[in-house]
Amino acid sequence: MGRVRTKTVKKSSRQVIEKYYSRMTLDFHTNKKILEEVAIIPSKRLRNKIAGFSTHLMKRIQKGPVRGISLKLQEEERERRMDFVPDESAIKTDEIKVDKETLEMLASLGMSDTLGISAVDPQQAMAPIPAFGGGRAPRRY
């Protein structure tokens, strides 16, 4: 069973990663040396804990965005995803096939002249649903 990390370790790791992300690596010993240079940490034990959690977070960042850490690269990627507009809509409304009853309802609402609506036979629109068991013979017990 793992150990519980204190709030101090988590907060300081996140701050160090946000400020010095370009210098941090996936190696514990390298991160420990970087922490020694950039931060004033009162004890060796605390420094090791922060370096260990920083290494853990760096590995998680490699897989995807991590909650609580705001990196420039992740911000830009998120904005690109939000601004993306597909070339072709996933919902195609060129032709909408409806049955006779639905056409009558649209006519009563005054929307019968809407473009792209075509009538379809109910038998043609509804495909037969296969019976449970795939249509094979019943079991013999």
Curated annotation (Swiss-Prot):
GO biological process terms on file: translation
Keywords tagged on the record: Ribonucleoprotein, Ribosomal protein
Keyword Ribonucleoprotein: yes
Keyword Ribosomal protein: yes
An example molecular function term from Gene Ontology annotations: structural constituent of ribosome
Domain of life of the organism encoding this protein: Eukaryota
InterPro entries referenced in this protein's UniProt entry, alphabetically: Ribosomal_eS17, Ribosomal_eS17_CS, Ribosomal_eS17_sf
Residue stretches spanning the membrane: none
GO cellular component: cytosolic small ribosomal subunit; mitochondrion; nucleolus
Similarity comment text for this entry: Belongs to the eukaryotic ribosomal protein eS17 family.
Official protein name in the record: Small ribosomal subunit protein eS17z
Organism: Arabidopsis thaliana (Mouse-ear cress)
